[in-house]
Amino acid sequence: MKISLKWLHDYVDVTEFFQKPEVLAEALTRGGLEVEEITNRAKDFNHVVIGHILEKDKHPNADKLSLCRVSTGEGVVHQIVCGAQNHKAGDRVIVALPGAVLPGNFAIKKSAVRGVDSAGMLCSLKELGLATESEGIAILPADAPVGKAYAEYGGYDDVTFELKVTANRADCLSHFGLAREVSTLFGKELKVPSSELKTNGKSSKSEIALDVKAFDLCPRYAGRFLKGVKVGPSPAWLKARLESVGMNSINNIVDVTNYVMLELGQPLHAFDAAFINGKKIIVDRAVAGEKFITLDGTEIALNGAELTIRDVNHPVCLAGVVGGKNSGVSDSTTEVFLEAAYFLPMSARKTSRSHGIDTDSSYRFARGVDPDGTLRGLNRAAALILEVAGGEAYADHHDFYPNPVKKAPVDITIKTVSDRLGYEAEEHKFVDFMKRLGCEINKKGETFTVLPPTFRFDIEQDMDLVEEYARLNGYEHIPEALPALAAAPSFQDKTFMLNRTTSELLRGEGFQQAVNFAFVGSKAQKAFLGSLEALKATGLAATEKEIRILNPLNEEMDVMRSSLSFGLFKNLNHNFHSGNMQGRLFEIGSTFFVKDDGSFAEGSRAGMAIWGRASNLWNKSLDYPVVYELKAAVEVLLKSLNISSYTWVTPANKSEVPEFLHQGQFAQLLVEGKKVGFIGTLHPLLLEDNKIRVPAALAELDLDQLYKGQPRPYRIQSVSKFPIVERDFAFVMPKALKVGDVLKDIRKAGAGLLLNVDVFDLYEGEKMEAGKKSVAIRIWLQDKNATLQETQINETTTKILESLKKNFDLSVR
């Protein structure tokens, strides 16, 4: 928002700031109103003065040029060559003398024009940047004082501030509002602009009637009827005031409404009373679907929620936003109905946003205008219209205000102020500050009861008063002090620390962390998870009954999630279709379920997802199942938690396999004999339906169970210095045979020297006979006390192979 210092000076003495505007800018910024830019307009008119043409002759060397002798006062006469033709001897003109710099960085200096010396330039308004078009040079009134600086004469000896007014300080969106703030900050006297109005003593009730129906959106509506006005250009002073803050002049009536809005912060609207059908103003909601044409000719369809100002036939104004073309003031207007109102900020804001219409009025109404300033603004505007456009005002006016807005009093003690600020507040300062703010203040005992003025929407509680004390006393006066820190042992949440450790480990395994909303769509979750009995069979707490959200954001977020798998699948699906053909994701979060007694509970889970073939890994074949990669990651997690007693189990009953997983590539995880989660490959039909063309696997673990007994004691062992021996075997086995059972048998048979065992290849191609698969297994052997001898290696491998032959009838290929 732009503020003119000269305009501000009408209401509060700011004389000392004309030479040092940065001092005022600094004070305003410290007070919470940031000054973004200071512009000294007078500098644009340095060396530009009013001149008097004494003589005008033809240029001796150019027919289209004239040679003028121009006085700039005190006996100083300049010879100036001019190319315009609209001037004559005796005219008062604007002269740019050597040293002046005009818009476009055009520097004026002494020069020769067609062989004749010229010491300046006679200017048009366009050349001074004051008009877009000009015909010839500017001719001033005959009484314009010769030699006077044009900036001072034209009202351009001004300083303007560009302010960033925060949303809570709507009371400062005007010159008087800012003057009130300056008065408060500096303790200066405030001069209130006159709203005295001379009337014709007659009643206007028969001219325009008023009916406020939507009083819930319009607590106050006032209006005046003016007749006999003459629409035309505004006087120079009014134009200059508007132009000083970047607003163009339209006509005298509209300019006055804009002037009062910029002066007092009260938006107004002027209707051509001749076009108000039925001679009645109705304040009511719009009719859904009806059309409205704005002042600029734009047609919009109303949705029925907007507050409108109407006549008996149609809307004539969108309340607080924009006027209608059908009732706007024109050159032929002679009767005006002048409106001033207090519309609820919510109403103006919604209308403005729904139709994308931002105006100076909507900007103010959306933030809140002073309901007690309505009549002052109305009468001020009416008086100015009579001054600049003539006419007469009727003695009465409309003022619908059935329930006056009242601010709630705030109770506070000086101790509260001191405690909140951290230093001793002074009672006499507090009382002074409250009075400067325009508050009514009473004291009873140690408690002050403060009644804020209606224009301060932001003062509602004691903390607001504490803030005002700190602001007016100066934030720079808050003493520097180190915070008092109590010497107490720090508390670390065990689950939080374990979650952080788990997250760091999974990131180390190449997973990236996903964070999903805890609320999901009931239909979508059920479609993905299917029956939750299968999920429950894996050891994860789940119930068919979902926990519904009372006030959901939308139907896609109406229940609390029962599993992390649904969210991770959506992440996987989105990533794949965004071009990420391979990836690893994990999430640590809560799931929610209903207990047997009907109460709600939540559990802590870890979910993991892997998709895409490991074709870019040198030690993995193209057909290496991703579920094995996921299994390996889970086992690394178990190892980090020092959990060694675990097994993978494939349920005999297929109903225990969740519907979104492959029934033949699924396993439940048992830790110390208790089910704590699952891993599995996503069901082929699910992948096909979602057009995911790579294998994918999911895991979900119950962290509440895994974290029990943490931290588990570690058994410290020295690292063997003796070499490890690897041996690879390939077996052809029935597809129905579980590889996990084979590995378990190898561990048992090779106990003593067997360090580890793992699958490194799986083949089920066309070259295999029906119902068979080829599994390649690697074992690692090590003696912790000596280098392995060949006889030891052969003895151990023989034990393993004999056991596999005996128990599974397996032989090496």
Curated annotation (Swiss-Prot):
This protein's UniProt keywords: Aminoacyl-tRNA synthetase, ATP-binding, Cytoplasm, Ligase, Magnesium, Metal-binding, Nucleotide-binding, Protein biosynthesis, RNA-binding, tRNA-binding
Residue stretches making up the B5 domain: 405-480
Catalytic activity entry: tRNA(Phe) + L-phenylalanine + ATP = L-phenylalanyl-tRNA(Phe) + AMP + diphosphate + H(+)
Coiled coil: none
Record GO terms (molecular function): ATP binding; magnesium ion binding; phenylalanine-tRNA ligase activity; tRNA binding
Gene3D superfamilies: 3.30.56.10, Bira Bifunctional Protein, Domain 2 (3.30.930.10), Ferrodoxin-fold anticodon-binding domain (3.30.70.380), Nucleic acid-binding proteins (2.40.50.140), Phenylalanyl-trna Synthetase, Chain B, domain 3 (3.50.40.10)
Domain tRNA-binding: from-to ranges: 42-151
SUPFAM superfamilies attached to this UniProt entry: Anticodon-binding domain of PheRS, Class II aaRS and biotin synthetases, Nucleic acid-binding proteins, PheT/TilS domain, Putative DNA-binding domain
Subcellular location, principal: cytoplasm
Domain (FDX-ACB): residue spans on this chain: 720-813
Cofactor(s) listed in the protein's UniProt record: Mg(2+)
NCBIfam families (alphabetical): pheT_bact, YtpR
Protein name: Phenylalanine--tRNA ligase beta subunit
Organism, scientific name: Bdellovibrio bacteriovorus (strain ATCC 15356 / DSM 50701 / NCIMB 9529 / HD100)
Underlying gene: pheT
